[in-house]
Amino acid sequence: MSNSPTVATLSQEYFDPNIPQILPHEKMYKIQVGKSLFKISGASLSSDGPSFFTEYFSKKRSPSNNDDSNNDTMESNKNEVLFIDRSAEVFEWIYQHLQGYIIEIKDEVQYTMLFADAMYYNLPRLRSLLKETDYYFTNIGGQSFKIAKNLFRREGDSPNYFEIYAATVYIDVEELIISKKLLRPPSHSAPYIPRSSEYFKDLLTLLGGASIDLDDNKRNALIKECRYYRLLNLEQRLIKSHISYNPITRKEEICLLLKDLSKKGITFPASSAFSTSPYFEDDFCSINECDSLSKTREQPANKKIKLDMTEKYNDSWNMLCYKRPFLDKHPRELIFQINSTDCTIILNKESQSIHVDITGESAYKFEALFGSHLPNTPSGAPKLKNYQYRFPSDSTQTKIETHYLLPACIYLCDLDINGIKISQVQTLLTDKNKFNDRVIDVSDPLDLRFCSGLKLYLRKSLWKLAVKDGNIMLIAIKAIAFNGTKEYYKGYEYL
């Protein structure tokens, strides 16, 4: 039971002049909520009105049509008590609000109950305060959280799960009460999210600007949490990346995992505004050309053939660039990493060509990223489906797998095969004794067959993607490869 001090003797000037004159400010009213009796002034009731209370007591003040009974009615009104069958505990908070105090909300249960009764009593100012509060209140994994809204000030972190929830659930309840003219608000449970409370604490730490030590497993777990809560800026900040400046091409480069790329960040510079290193030219990526290059480099230094070669290959490719959503102001040349054996380099002995075979999850991700995001060229936009093939799975022979067989350049690649560093890639390409594998020949897309060649299965690899004249080429930057079953099992680790 709560009793406020008598304020009938206080003057009109004592009250806030912004309080509307709905009820007499100096008059005291009695309201019993549950088992508790509250005495409250007209000024306090008028401070948040019009409301259920101001309408009720205003009607009681209206004079009766029977003048003889006016005095009796006014006398009875002095002793009248408004009975309300609601929670006295919740009304205690509302009582403090009407008296001008700030309500310190502790958790999601208090917030939900307070919001429901603010609707029930039709308190417009309290409803507005609750909707515009500086915090979100929720329960995650059994632990209550009071989340400051300014943690989501960065672009991409809003709108998020909490903002959308607050903008829909509570507003829907409000509209339901108003439209259906319900006597009381429908029962509504406090928000509960069945996620890890420990991971969410880490997210709050990062949102607040602090840093924490993360291994790969925890980093991936937090990225999943960011996607669940729609914290897109924080997700990008958690994704592993490396930015560097290439002094040869005089361009910035960014390295990311293929699985972490977003279609929104993919861009290509205009052909006229970009000229790459001559070593990215496709002729350098055939077996014959590597052989001729090897011979060329054996020529005396005073020969002019190097200058001629530079002029011959001083053409431009459109290199794939990437701009991280919500973080980067300008795009950088992209190097993407594939961390699985979904990627295989195929060297064809007959056609003297090099392709990279991408399959499995990497193929699906590759298609999702580049299926409709390749730029137009004078020869038309490259079509990824032109490089798509479907073969039976090697394991079951019944499941059909999608393969992307794309022209590749490995001349610049820092290549490690079977644990041995290959210092000169052209020596590998010109050693015909190594070409004993059975590989797919895609020289004629309408007549696929197998031929002799060399397969390099990649454990990890770094790539650039280039486009020119409607064609696509993948440029290997760094790769760890194996060739053969024994070498594959060397990569096994004990449990």
Curated annotation (Swiss-Prot):
Entry GO terms, CC: cytoplasm; mitochondrion; nucleus
| Entry keywords, A to Z | Cytoplasm, Nucleus
Q: InterPro entries from the xrefs?
A: BTB/POZ_dom, SKP1/BTB/POZ_sf, T1-type_BTB
State the superkingdom: Eukaryota
The protein's matches in Pfam families, at most eight in alphabetical order, are given as:
BTB_2
Q: Which GO terms describe its biological process?
A: protein homooligomerization
Coiled coil feature spans = none
Q: Where in the cell is it found?
A: Cytoplasm; Nucleus
Report TM segments: none
Q: Is Nucleus set as a keyword in this record?
A: yes
Q: Which SMART domains match?
A: BTB
Q: Does the keyword Cell division apply?
A: no
What further note is attached to this protein's record?
Present with 172 molecules/cell in log phase SD medium.
Protein name, per record: Uncharacterized protein YDR132C
Q: Which organism is it from?
A: Saccharomyces cerevisiae (strain ATCC 204508 / S288c)
